[in-house]
Amino acid sequence: MFYQTIYPTYQVFVALGVSCIITLVLMPLFIKLMKKEGVGQQVRADGPQQHLVKQGTPTMGGVVMLVSILLTCIALAQWNTDLILAMAAMLLTGSLGLLDDIESVAHGRSLGLTASQKMAGLITISVAFCLAAVNIWGITPIIAFPGGLEINLGILTTTVNLGGNVLSIPWLYLFFVFLLMAGLSNAVNLTDGLDGLAGGCVMVVMIFMAAVAFRYGESSLAVFAASIAGACIGFLWFNSYPASIFMGDTGSLAWGAAFAALAVLTKTEVVSLVMGGLFIIEALSVIIQVVSYKATKKRVFLMAPLHHHFEKLGWNETKVVFRFWIISGAFAALGFALYFQLH
């Protein structure tokens, strides 16, 4: 709408500010609505005891953030194929998270959809995204590593003729994109366990991803990433300790999918794993804990994900959050530095 009247560099900063402002304006109204309807977070009974006071805190704040991002991109971004693909991945995964949140609230429990239901949704979304990225946007099924190493994941490709149109199905790359999108979505979701933790970490990563997208020549994706960062900044005003609202799976699953989509569309699939290193560590802590307990009946961590381990060690919630923000920023900066080894 207004993208032609604003210099591309400024679009990114304006998008961050506009998305932040929209979130700041709409979130109080949403919090009031959630309180009126009695929609609140269900807290794990086996979690840290100090978290029990969070029971009933309004949730699904990710809805407002998604609306803010969509409105910002409508106003400031050029809607080309790459933006449509990234937006679709985010909104569809956010919708999956919304269903999970609704299920959780409706049944008064901390768990919503079953693991198989979530996985089926993530498989569908990631496969559709990958096929569209390869066949419509022309993304090559090659992953690049810093230093020049490249691995071709298109060596096992099936072509299907659909009424004169050829559909390429790169099986290895398809599986890789599924792992990336499902992995990052769940990793961000696992990180969302303390007030301000996931929102702050996503904000930091998306600022760096906006810089990556802009340097890659994708100004629309830069606006998209900046609008997510802006929405996170606005959200943190209400989610900082003690939180007035949580983003819910609506937000956490959506940000992971958006991160994965940006990584694929800017061909930074490997570097993105470094930039999102904090999310990866959080997810790995859960995997290690589960595997260790099943194999030896012993736990490696006092509690998983990792942020709860440090709470159990006596760190207060805000100290864990701020230190994890610093770690997330360090990983994002390292990934950004490695990006220059790709291009």
For each feature predicted by the language model, list its residue ranges.
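Alpha-helical transmembrane segments
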Residues: 1-35, 65-98, 102, 129, ...
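Membrane-interface loops
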Residues: 31-48
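Membrane-interfacial loop-to-helix junctions in multi-pass inner-membrane proteins
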Residues: 79-87, 106-121
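Hydrophobic alpha-helical transmembrane segments
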Residues: 95, 119-128
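Membrane interface segments of multi-pass transport proteins and intramembrane proteases
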Residues: 104-113, 142-153, 162-166, 316
